[in-house]
């Protein structure tokens, strides 16, 4: 991710931030997220690490496979989409289809975290991320295209959950107020 995008991300909460707020992120604790949002510092690992490298390299390939398997054309949208209702929430989507679905691309080394293909049985942190994206965009369905262990391609489908989105809004508001108040 480029430096300007990382600076822009400090102005609000994105999908991966939501899992951290709930304490479900593998990558960041709520405290680390708070420090990230309240300082101007950009961590080196946010700019480049193996996961970012491989994710960026494989994303277009996974999207091509997604299009081939579903028949849905997936295109990269604007880098950051800000919520019209909650001005501190944004989404950085991997793709949007020609039929109004979000497509989230993942790579994973652990197949046991993923349920039956076609279901919504995916890791909790990704459920939060995806519900956040649907909350920000107003879209109702997200397809998850995941490449597991380098050769196992699977598709999952998650529908908007208004109850969970309401919980996300409440926790995000509380967290963002702490960021604004520096408390």
Residue ranges and their predicted role:
Residues 1-61:
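Charged, glycine-rich intrinsically disordered N-terminal tails and low-complexity linkers that flank
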Residues 52, 68-176, 180:
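Nucleic-acid nuclease catalytic cores
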């Amino acid at each position: 991710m480029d430096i300007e995008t990382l600076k822009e991300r400090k102005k609000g909460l994105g999908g991966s931030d939501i899992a951290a707020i709930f304490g479900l992120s593998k990558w960041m604790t709520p405290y680390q997220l708070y420090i990230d949002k309240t300082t101007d510092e950009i961590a080196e690992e946010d700019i480049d690490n193996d996961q970012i490298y491989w994710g960026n390299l494989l994303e277009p390939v996974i999207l091509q496979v997604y299009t081939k398997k579903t028949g849905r054309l997936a295109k990269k949208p604007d880098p950051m989409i800000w919520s019209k209702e909650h001005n501190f929430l944004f989404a950085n989507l991997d793709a949007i289809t020609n039929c109004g679905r979000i497509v989230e691309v993942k790579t994973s080394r652990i197949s046991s975290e993923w349920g039956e293909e076609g279901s919504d049985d995916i890791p909790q942190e990704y459920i939060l991320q995806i519900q956040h994206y649907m909350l920000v965009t107003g879209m109702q369905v997200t397809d998850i295209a995941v490449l597991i262990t380098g050769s196992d391609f699977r598709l999952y489908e998650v529908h908007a959950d208004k109850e969970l989105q309401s919980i996300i809004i409440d926790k995000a508001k509380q967290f963002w107020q702490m960021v604004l108040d520096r408390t």
